[in-house]
Amino acid sequence: MANHDPISDMLTRIRNASEKRHEKTKVPASRMSLSIAKVLQSEGFIAEINEEGEGFRKQLILGLKYTGKHRSPIIRSMQRVSRPGLRIYKNTRGLPKVLGGLGIAIISTSNGVMSDRDARKQGVGGEVLCYVC
């Protein structure tokens, strides 16, 4: 069966693996999923990104991060905002702050995929892909 929303699939795989305390999770590779993974890594939500396979079988292996003695997941919540049936676009002033700045919104802009903080610094808006906190 075809996957009509690969971003939601990626977020769900990360969320499920994080809740089950897995060290790593595999995500089908695409330019968008790699860009989102790089933003998550730069913001400290995931530890590492590796690629495996070739062509259509290419996958990203994401190393998840945990904190404390009981290995609490760093990623507490991931929520898809813009979806194929309802795209959500915001200008620079309309970019959301997630949990008062404790979380991030991942934005797809004309300058590439970036966090809401970077988009504000660069003065660009775009499609709000998801919230992570």
UniProtKB/Swiss-Prot annotation:
Disulphide bridges, residue numbers: none
Keywords, alphabetical: Ribonucleoprotein, Ribosomal protein, RNA-binding, rRNA-binding
Compositionally biased spans, kind Basic and acidic residues: 16-26
CC per GO annotation: ribonucleoprotein complex; ribosome
Any one Pfam family match given in the protein's UniProt record, by short name: Ribosomal_S8
Molecular function via GO: rRNA binding; structural constituent of ribosome
UniProt-annotated stretches for the region Disordered: 1-28
The keyword Electron transport is annotated on this UniProt entry: no
Gene Ontology biological-process entries: translation
Domain of life per record: Bacteria
Role of this protein: One of the primary rRNA binding proteins, it binds directly to 16S rRNA central domain where it helps coordinate assembly of the platform of the 30S subunit.
Subunit structure: Part of the 30S ribosomal subunit. Contacts proteins S5 and S12.
Protein family: Belongs to the universal ribosomal protein uS8 family.
Name used for this protein in its record: Small ribosomal subunit protein uS8
Organism annotation: Prochlorococcus marinus (strain NATL1A)
Gene: rpsH
